[in-house]
Amino acid sequence: IDVISGATFTSIGFKNALIDAAKQAEASDLDGFKKNTVVHTAGEAIEKTTDVVVVGAGGAGMATAVQSAQNGNSVVVLEVNSEIGGNTVASGGQFQSAQSYLVWDPADPDATTGVYKGVTYNKVHNATGNIKVLKEILNWNENEFDSKYFDSTPFVAGDIETLSHAGVHAEYLGTLKELKSEIQAYLNWAQPQLDAGKAEGEITLFSTPNLHIFQTYYGGLRQNAEKTSWIYGSYDLVKQFVEGGQDLKGWLEDQGAIFDNSIQPIIVGALWNRENDFKGSDLNGDGTPDPDGKNVKGKTVYNTYFATTRKTLLETVANHADNEIMLRTKVTELITDKDGKVVGVKGVQYDGTPVTVHAKKGVVLATGGYAADIKRVMETNDYWPDGDITTHTGTTNRSSLVGSGIDMAEAVGAATTGMGFTQMMPISWVDNGNLAFGGGHY
């Protein structure tokens, strides 16, 4: 029995009660009972062959596994923890994607409602300051980004009014031009209403994939601590992330996920109102949410993203009998062929049983980062000033996020990028590591 973080004294009291019960029962080995040690015996080595191996059963891993299976591949997922969910199940649970039926429609600009899957919803409205942001983007300098602009002007992350004067990286120029055209059409409709005295919060929200792409670009544009280099998101990856994300909600709903289809909120760290809020799952299709542990948020996140995908992978996809999730299995090594191609993995289960899984088509690493290894975060840091990260700095990540996948990939020659730019949330005290609310809700 382990002590649970956040319930330390309760856990100790529970363990003391068990020891007292063991004494009253005249346990034959009370000292052994107190040691709380479980001895595992390794089984025979396990060796399997499948089409696709996925390492990590978090949001990325399970999405990859299900899509691979839906594409006709057999899949084996290996997860170090005792349950699927990864870091996603410990997150706030929302994902960003603009829902066209809830926002301003240039084809029907005066519409106050939209229809999704046969149900009519009220369109959502702007938050205070949204239109100011749109106007700043509309005036963004279209010249090639000039980092020398900040030789005389301090760079402040999030200050887009200043950032907009420095230009734009060439690969994002096309998106910026398209976005400006979208914004201009919107302002041609919205500005007369503002001029007539209508409040910003009464005007239908503007939100498009192009805005999401461009905000991901400037939201991630950063200087390193020494002010000698810059980093920003790869355009192709950001575009894929945003445009592919437009299909995520429907894909999950087809598997039984439930979302609040009436809102597009914003959470801590986000730049726009385009969050999709989770509501659980309806796996039997009876129209009511499945039990979620007395509305425990972590359980609801699990139901939305993992009860659904797990059922698809192991029960409902056409080739479900060919798929498997191996829990409490730590992958320790990537297997490569003579040409350096990764063709499988080696690992070990919780009891010491060795595991080898060969992949006929590919191996996907979905093991997350290393936020739970604060010393490593400090060692790789190239962004935060001295003193902003200390050994006391806490994390909202799970304890298994220690960079094992990165280590294995580097061991077979994989390159990394952006390792020095760790994202920090404004909810931690640097001096003592205490965390405020972890879900990200205001």
Predicted segments — roles?
Residues 38-50, 419-442:
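Mid-to-C-terminal Rossmann-like scaffold of FAD/NAD(P)H-dependent oxidoreductases
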Residues 1-36:
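Active-site- and interface-proximal helix/loop "cap" or "latch" segments in soluble metabolic
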Residues 348-354, 358-432:
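Glycine-rich loop(s) and the adjacent beta-strand/alpha-helix scaffold that form part
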Residues 148, 152-353, 374-375, 429:
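Conserved redox-cofactor binding core of oxidoreductases
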Residues 90-139:
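N-terminal glycine-rich dinucleotide-binding loop that anchors FAD/FMN and/or NAD(P) in oxidoreductases
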Residues 41-60, 76:
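Beta1/beta-strand and adjacent pyrophosphate-binding region of the FAD-binding site
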Residues 86-90, 100-101, 107, 263-265, ...:
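Short, solvent-exposed loop/turn and secondary-structure capping segments
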Residues 70-90:
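Glycine-rich FAD pyrophosphate-binding loop
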